[in-house]
Amino acid sequence: MALVDPDIFNKDPREHYDLLQRLGGGTYGEVFKARDKVSKDLVALKMVKMEPDDDVATLQKEILMLKTCRHANIVAYHGSYLWLQKLWICMEFCGAGSLQDIYQVTGSLSELQISYVCREVLQGLAYLHSEKKIHRDIKGANILINDCGEVKLADFGISAQIGATLARRLSFIGTPYWMAPEVAAVALKGGYNELCDIWSLGITAIELAELQPPLFDVHPLRVLFLMTKSGYQPPRLKEKSRWSSSFHNFVKVTLTKNSKKRPSATKMLSHQLVSQPGLNRGLILDLLDKMKNPGKGLPVDIEDEEPEPPPAIPRRIRSTYRASSLGIPDADCCRRQMEFQRPRCVDCRPQAETVRLYPPAHFGSTSPRSQLSDSDDDYDDVDIPAPSENIPPPLPPKPKFRSPSDDGSGGIRDDGQLSPGVLVRCASGPPPRTPRPGPPPATCSPHLTARSDPSLWNPAAPEPGQPPLVPPRKEKMRGKMENEKRREKYPLLVKLFNGCPLQIHSTAAWTHPSTKDQNLLLGAEEGIFILNRNDQEATLEMIFPGRTTWLYCINNLLMSLSGKTPYLYSHSILGLLERKDGRTGSPIAHISPHRLLARKNMVSSKIQDTKGCRACCVAESASSGGPFLCGALETSVVLLQWYQPMNKFLLVRQVLFPLPTPLPVFTLLTTPGSELPAVCIGVSPGQAAKSVLFHTVRFGALSCWLDDSSTEHKGPVQVIQVKEDMVMVLMDGSLKLVTPEGAPAPGLRTPEIPMTEAVEAVAMVEDRLEAFWKHGVQVWAPGLKQPLQELRDPTLTFRLLCSPRPVVVETRPTDDPTAPSNLYIQE
């Protein structure tokens, strides 16, 4: 590859510089703090990742242009290196960082500080424009401050050209929040000139005053669309009384929509805001001192809600189950252990419980683990027989691999019926690495009871005097065998936690990106808690205080509906964990999170204009890119979409609409070919062609409300879209499978399933329907009129907390609804 300038070296820059520290990274690469090995001067090395087909020659020409830029307000260029498909650009080092880094710690700048920054930037722009150069990327992140308080423009020239060369690899380069309207409409109106930098400076002035540019919570593509509309109005400062008339006028003049009427940088230097006396580096030095001591004068958000009351429970909660002392328990206690807990055995040491409720084994079957050696005694799975009601249970022996034929836990009883068995893990260490055998095949009985009632394990015997049942026909046997296969796939409930005192509203699953530990996040009345499923001892740890009613996890980011006055929040999960680990031994303070940390280190932030949010829902659409998030506000409905380059949800639409109270349903529905989803806020019975009528608010065109709000339902109402062309509707004691338009779902023999119990919630797990009612759960196959399996226990109340990833169930004693709960998960 031919080089066009001897200053661009084909060698490793680390031969000349010692890399000291990584300062940050972005779309194009990383920036490092380095020291010259000869002069010992500090420099900044920007490493840009290249591709073999990138236009390196054009990049080199742009780099050569940087050599000619010599100005006090422009970061000096020292040279470049091209090594191993990476372009290294050596620039002047500015130790205080960018203005964006600074205001994230200090809060908004004062008007005098903003005036000084704008004057220095205008001086740099006036020089660039006189040299026929355009910066193209003026914003807070590209305005650097050195330790002396001097203001420097960075990323000149090279960023624009890099963006052009990398456009083949990235669908959307940069963000349009600082972009001038003529740049956004370049495809429609032609080119632009250096005055686009003046517009960007006006947006930057608003950014320094309000900590973000206008429309920053709106999706970038929507911002581009808005700026190209003829009725687009330039933004203004929000708080009129806080800023002087001179500042308001400066923003107005720089944000002149017609670029031909927009003043030049030289003319703007005579504006009253930047020509006033008293603008000197001391203003920035005061700002740097405030950054080094963020506790001084940290601004308080006047819209903050009242402080949360101190939590009534500890921030670390351990599972209450412990291995009991050696003894012979009574029959009821032993039966309870067989249901959900480990047996009382000598070698059991405290550890997170794993309990499986298995259907009974086939006649004459033996345990697949009976052939294993005794060397794995620490990880035994023990088959325990159901106790007789009249005979006290014997003292449990030391756990040992035994087959049902050895200990009587399976096989034929004296009365000819199969005896049930419950497999209970009793482990003193981590589970074995060898794969565990699957659950034993189910019998033909559809019932599985948590109380191990033998009458529910097997088909009922015919009453005396009745003829025997006629054998099924061959054509029916095939369907029966398919049902048996479905039963074998039924995922069993595994206990996660015993004795949970929280009032849980929502859950979400999250996998740690480094350790790969599987975690369960709980949104409760007391706050947000995390449970590491890989820990030896089950422990709930608070990571965010305050009432939380809804959770959603995406890309190590947690969205929540939290607070005494509910707001939609965005949390960095890794940041929450780091803050928790740094506070070991001291409780989390019951004040707003942003008052605890400097702004740069904030891990939790409110989504603007979501005060009083009543409900949230999420829908994923393959045709539209990232998932959609919808929020029900007091007088409107907002729709946000995930934007991967910024790793956040951004506003797409907001519809003013008076939502009903109460709000029984709030679910997003997507249809094939539609750009935006609709939000369902109610359902009602339909006619034959449309068995369900969805009451929806649509975002694409005019809002649509199917006016049948007076419908009263018998029992709970639930709407879940399980596939792109199938919606599951629980209404009036039956479960209907319909299309997003409300018509019966095609390909099903029975699109409506009448529930045999008072079902409170439903979930679709793979190809199974799971219906949860007060004392158990039924498992159905779509299109069948009879449940495949059933788990029931009248002594417990069941509540579905989350589905479908994963299904989390909470149980409490029926006779004590306020008792601590047990938490289960489906594998």
Swiss-Prot record:
Pfam families: CNH (PF00780), Pkinase (PF00069). Residues 472-485 have a biased composition (Basic and acidic residues). This is Mitogen-activated protein kinase kinase kinase kinase 1. Residues 374-383 have a biased composition (Acidic residues). Residues 296-315, 359-485 are annotated as: Disordered. Residues 501-806 form the CNH domain. Keywords: ATP-binding, Kinase, Nucleotide-binding, Phosphoprotein, Serine/threonine-protein kinase, Transferase, Ubl conjugation. Autophosphorylates: phosphorylation promotes ubiquitination by the Cul7-RING(FBXW8) ubiquitin-protein ligase complex, leading to its degradation by the proteasome. Tyrosine-phosphorylated after activation of hemopoietic cells.
